[in-house]
């Protein structure tokens, strides 16, 4: 392999790739480029992507474009492949995973709902109960109690956390929040070494809008790519790639 004036033997490159733990990432890129070739964007679509890229990076001048490519050791075809890959992967994911996406969304919806909640945690059960009574009776605001007494990082935000997907929370915590109504304050409960006070501020049900659709398609694509790389690393023969071109 030669990069400008630097020449490296191919066997040395192989060793470097292994020692740098780059075998899996390189295999993943190989699979992505195989998918790109399988999808086969037409020249008009690639031209549009290239023009948009050149305008965004102020590379419409040929001299600037050539210098940009030379700096990276790329050819013009390398750039077109680089620009084609995200769109090709997007189309591949849509065709492969799109038909079952609604069912997949419904299966995961409980973890995709986002929640805004207030949390106060202490180690002393007596203090937890005393604070719960004071907050419940309006003697002290939750925010003030959390800022003063909470032993976790939520003290800096006066107890307020989120919004975040329920699936990112500790399962016990997420389960408790699922069963609260907005504004409900739970009595002190123990989770691990902590006694918690929880109040649900807002629960936002996930919707299968375009942003959610693209997120789920990307997640499924990543899972598929990683599984294919694992099979290649294990010496297995992966399934043949298929993509049906639109008429």
Where are these regions (language model features)?
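Peptidyl-prolyl cis-trans isomerase
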Residues: 2-247
């Amino acid at each position: 392999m030669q990069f400008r004036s630097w020449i490296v033997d191919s066997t040395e490159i192989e060793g470097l790739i292994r020692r740098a733990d780059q075998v899996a990432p390189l295999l993943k890129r190989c699979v992505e480029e195989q998918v790109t070739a399988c999808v086969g964007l037409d020249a008009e679509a690639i031209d549009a992507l290239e023009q948009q890229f050149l305008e965004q990076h102020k590379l419409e001048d040929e001299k600037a474009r050539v210098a940009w490519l030379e700096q990276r050791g790329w050819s013009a075809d390398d750039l077109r492949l680089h620009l084609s890959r995200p769109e090709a992967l997007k189309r591949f994911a849509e065709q492969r995973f799109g038909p079952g996406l609604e069912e997949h969304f419904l299966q995961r919806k409980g973890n995709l709902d986002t929640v805004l909640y207030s949390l106060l945690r202490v180690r002393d059960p007596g203090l937890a109960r005393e604070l719960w009574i004071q907050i419940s009776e309006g003697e002290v605001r939750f925010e003030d109690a959390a800022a003063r007494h909470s032993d976790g990082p939520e003290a800096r935000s006066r107890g307020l956390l989120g919004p975040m997907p329920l699936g990112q929370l500790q399962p016990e915590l997420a389960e408790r929040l699922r069963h609260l109504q907005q504004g409900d304050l739970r009595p002190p409960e123990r989770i691990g070494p902590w006694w918690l006070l929880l109040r649900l501020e807002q629960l936002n049900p996930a919707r299968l809008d375009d942003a959610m659709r693209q997120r789920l398609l990307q997640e499924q694509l990543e899972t598929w790519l990683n599984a294919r790389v694992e099979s290649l690393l294990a010496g297995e023969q992966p399934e043949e790639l298929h993509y049906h071109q639109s008429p």
